[in-house]
């Protein structure tokens, strides 16, 4: 606990891949190493109190470390999110809420300007489904991303994309263009 608090005070994020949260998993952890075993609720409370980022699988662990290495620790729990799918925006909102992240609304004073950059079928929201009519068109998505980021008080921005299925190689360029526009 003291090491985590010391790291937190220095702005150094700590990420934990906690196993042994099920009854059997906890028993296996105790019999194998005896480390980080016990009530999952107690550990989650400890992690929350000390600022430890808790993940539940190796993919989350690696992606979290990658994010922290590239972007650094978020300055707040507020996000601005983008996806080219209404379902994706909904999933993003649902999952973020589960891990105590927030999507603040778009500043009402900038809503009209953002709406003017979007296709008529789009709804101004955060997270934002910028819709397929402008998907992959960097000259159209960059202004949307830029305006939305400035219109929401957020510590981080996230772009969520579906990975193209095998055989859909022709669509990769659209994903790449949106990623480039987002990264600018």
Give the positions of each predicted feature.
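Catalytic-core regions of core metabolic enzymes
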Residues: 1-184
